[in-house]
Regions:
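Active-site/catalytic core of tyrosine-dependent DNA strand-transfer enzymes
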Residues: 115-119, 126-191
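C-terminal catalytic core of tyrosine-transesterase DNA break-rejoin enzymes
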Residues: 11, 58, 62, 69, ...
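N-terminal DNA-binding recognition helix of tyrosine site-specific recombinases/integrases
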Residues: 1-22, 66
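Short coil/turn motifs that cap or connect alpha-helices
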Residues: 66, 74-76, 81, 214, ...
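Catalytic-site neighborhood detector that most strongly recognizes the C-terminal catalytic loop/helix
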Residues: 27, 35, 91, 140, ...
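C-terminal secondary-structure termini that scaffold catalytic or DNA-interacting sites
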Residues: 82, 91-127, 137-139, 168-169, ...
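Proline-centered turn/helix-capping motifs that create local helix->coil transitions or kinks
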Residues: 9-19, 93-99, 145-157, 261-262
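Long, amphipathic, Lys/Arg-enriched alpha-helical "connector/arm" segment
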Residues: 22, 26-53, 62-65, 138
Length: 262
């Protein structure tokens, strides 16, 4: 409020010179990223079993995906034959008219009084965000079981039958719903409050804490656009044995994938 007041006073000749012009702006203090360690992620994974957001939580922990990337995964992106999961699109909620033609498809509308478009974008945050994961046995079995379960569910709508993250009646689980239910999940289980996006940081930090993985490997796994992003945020490696990235992540948890999904 002080700055605008002095500008108004100078403009209307109440003062000769705005003293705020010579005041240096304080430098922004970089906020440390809050994330979970392996023990906390283990507790979260157990708490998420059977919850509304079980699948989004698992995909965030194991793959370090963003909310929009998780919601955007379709079964066409899951290549069971070659054990590959392709991340190439995302889902957002908003006004589709501001997006370039041919870069998206409106797949539904929210049910709020101010209805918004549910948009499947054919592009991600950056070009490097488009990536493919080799699916290990644990995630392969989980996704196989999930697909089989969805094939026999009684759906309220078929609009989202190709999407991986749907609820018990086949409705797409939207990014904001993930955030809402994630906060409730933490409250109900007495877990420290973090943002859902912090699960991405948690996943990448687990890899960075393992000297078996180079920063380049971690950059590719995370889908960072440049090496410096990975290095500046996650350059705190210390120990562990050599494994593939996904094998290492899943090995950190006791029962991320329980027997029901194997």
């Amino acid at each position: 409020l002080i700055g605008p007041a002095f500008r108004y006073a100078e403009k209307n000749d109440f003062i000769l010179k705005n003293p705020m012009r010579v005041v240096d702006k304080p430098s922004k203090v970089k906020k440390e990223s809050s994330y979970y360690n392996a023990e906390q992620l283990n507790k979260l994974a157990k708490a998420a079993k059977g919850s509304y957001i079980e699948t989004p939580v698992i995909l965030a922990i194991v793959l370090g995906l963003r909310r929009s990337e998780i919601v955007g995964i379709t079964w066409n992106n899951v290549d069971f034959a070659n054990r590959l999961l392709h991340i190439k699109q995302s889902v957002i909620v908003g006004d589709s008219s501001i997006l370039p033609q041919g870069t998206y498809r409106v797949i539904g509308h929210t049910k709020s009084h101010k209805s918004k478009d549910i948009i499947l974008k054919y592009f991600l945050k950056t070009d490097s965000s488009e990536r493919s994961f080799t699916i290990n046995d644990a995630l392969y079995n989980y996704l196989k079981a999930l697909k089989a379960e969805q094939e026999v569910m009684i759906r309220e709508t078929n609009a989202y039958k190709d999407f991986v993250c749907v609820n018990a009646v086949g409705t797409l689980i939207l990014p904001d719903s993930i955030t809402h239910y994630f906060t409730n999940l933490l409250d109900e289980n007495g877990l420290p409050h973090i943002k859902f996006h912090a699960l991405r940081h948690s996943c990448i930090s687990l890899l960075a804490n393992n000297t078996a993985f180079t920063m380049k490997q971690i950059q590719d796994y995370a889908g960072h656009s440049d090496f410096l992003t990975t290095f500046n945020v996650y350059s705190h490696a210390d120990n562990s044995a050599k494994k593939t990235e996904m094998d290492y992540i899943t090995s950190c948890f006791d029962d991320l994938f329980d027997d029901d999904n194997n």
